[in-house]
Amino acid sequence: MGIKKYNPTTNGRRNMTTNDFAEITTDRPEKSLLAPLSKKAGRNNQGKITVRHQGGGHKRQYRIIDFKRNKDGIPGRVATIEYDPNRSANIALINYVDGEKRYILAPKNLEVGMEIMSGAEADIKIGNALPLINIPVGTVVHNIELKPGRGGQLVRSAGTSAQVLGKEGKYVLVRLTSGEVRLVLSACRATVGQVGNESHELIKIGKAGRSRWLGKRPTVRGSVMNPVDHPHGGGEGRSPIGRKSPMSPWGKPTLGFKTRKKNKASDKFIVRRRKK
């Protein structure tokens, strides 16, 4: 997918870029696969902010995505490639021969009319989903499960991909987008190919208002807050933070401080840590 630039008619337009949406084939989603999506604005059930900088934004409907890819042995044909406001990747509507319709993440180079399949007997081609044990070493994959049957949890963002490096007993070695090498159960499924819409990372927002359309609120620096609101707050004028190292709003060290738990259960599955 290409990047569309704009004439500098205003300061906001001068640096703005968007997708050209050349791959999108329809602007009407499948109604049976839509669900209501209410605004949370970063609040929990008590009304307290648990995630900052969220709120507002355009109204959305949730698209029900098939991350499990468990419709084994039944071929499906790609009907449309669609935009999904809830994720960076595009989605593809699949019409199966038994009449069912499902959305999947649209891999790179997937086109309308192509046939896809799920299951251990599926061919190694773009869009097909198989157990990792059936995928050859060196294959590029996405939408990887961590537990069999739970549905894909890893490598789902636009342009991301992982690679199968080897097989060890009941585990398969997978190199993730971050560079981390991880053991995944061989019964877990993955989809062949790279996630599409790889130019998503090149988009420039251009103006503050466009971030608000996306539901993102401003990020205020701690140094301009009051002491009651942030460890960096207070002082006369532009004061130093008065700490040995920068702190989060909750008084924890930040900017380089490791936050991963020391004895996390999944550590034994990580063969090589991600790149710094």
Curated annotation (Swiss-Prot):
The keyword Transcription appears for this protein: no
Name of the gene: rplB
Coiled-coil boundaries: none
Domain of life: Bacteria
Subunit text: Part of the 50S ribosomal subunit. Forms a bridge to the 30S subunit in the 70S ribosome.
Protein purpose: One of the primary rRNA binding proteins. Required for association of the 30S and 50S subunits to form the 70S ribosome, for tRNA binding and peptide bond formation. It has been suggested to have peptidyltransferase activity; this is somewhat controversial. Makes several contacts with the 16S rRNA in the 70S ribosome.
Protein name according to UniProt: Large ribosomal subunit protein uL2
Keyword rRNA-binding attributed: yes
Any one cellular-component term (Gene Ontology): large ribosomal subunit
The entry's keywords: Ribonucleoprotein, Ribosomal protein, RNA-binding, rRNA-binding
Organism, scientific name: Bacillus anthracis
Chain spans, region Disordered: 1-20, 219-276
NCBIfam families: rplB_bact
GO biological process: cytoplasmic translation
Compositionally biased tracts (Polar residues): 7-20
InterPro entries membership: NA-bd_OB-fold, Rib_uL2_dom2, Ribosomal_uL2, Ribosomal_uL2_bac/org-type, Ribosomal_uL2_C, Ribosomal_uL2_CS, Ribosomal_uL2_dom3, Ribosomal_uL2_RNA-bd_dom
Entry similarity comment: Belongs to the universal ribosomal protein uL2 family.
GO molecular function, one term: structural constituent of ribosome
SMART domains xref list: Ribosomal_L2, Ribosomal_L2_C
